Amino acid sequence: MSEKNILKEILKPYWYEKLSSTILNNKDYDYFFNDKDRFFPNLENVFNAVNNIDLEKKTKVVVFGQDPYPRKESATGYAFWDGKIKSWNDRLSPSFKNLFKSILISYGVAEKKDNIAKLRKTISDKAIFSPDDFFEKSIKNNIIWLNASFSFEGKAQSLLNKHLKFWKPVVKEIIKVLLESSDDVIFVFWGKKSLKFQKFIIDTGYKNYHFVENGHPMLENFHDKNSFNDINEILEKINKNKIDWLNI
């Protein structure tokens, strides 16, 4: 298999048609695609978040993260989905913990001050599904967990910037497709890197978008706002069904 054909192996045909020219014409293409072991996630998982978008559904929620998890076993190709975590009793990263804590707060069954032990008890008492089940069900309901950068190589700022620069035009093409194929798109920005796409969305000329902003879930001030309530408020305003986050 030639290096140039690797995209056909890891992108579904529709997305290959939409994204391949942007990727193949990037001067850093070889750097990103000729060494399968250079970065996380595994190459076959890099486009998971894109390949599983159901374009037939006219209302979409796009949750922007920043970078993949810096561990091969954790990086899934989706923002915030940590593949290493199979049970709520596993060690949770701050981002993962705060994301689900915020969902519980939105239902009034948790408080900002609750520690991890109390959160686990609440999850057990409510018989809430596993972490993997949550993400799988949300994806089927067309919640799109999209990182601003699709790959991670190292924590050096120069590397973070290199990856972000490579993926930025790709993410822009994805955004255009989502706006073209949808009645409404709710873009959820968690973290400063993802906010850089706001101006691009506005400048596309489309009017079918809505914004939800918050800090990154790794920080405790993530709970100063509740993005999950904000998403449902927008859905209610545009006469769409609200999302039952605990029973997606």
Each model region followed by its residue ranges:
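Low-complexity, highly charged intrinsically disordered N-terminal segments
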Residues: 1-11
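A polyanion-binding, active-site-adjacent surface
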Residues: 9-182, 195-196, 210, 216-222, ...
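Tryptophan-centric aromatic hotspots in well-structured domains and transmembrane helices
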Residues: 138, 167, 190, 245-248
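Extended, basic/helix-rich recognition subdomains
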Residues: 181-204
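C-terminal accessory segment of soluble enzyme catalytic cores
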Residues: 198-248
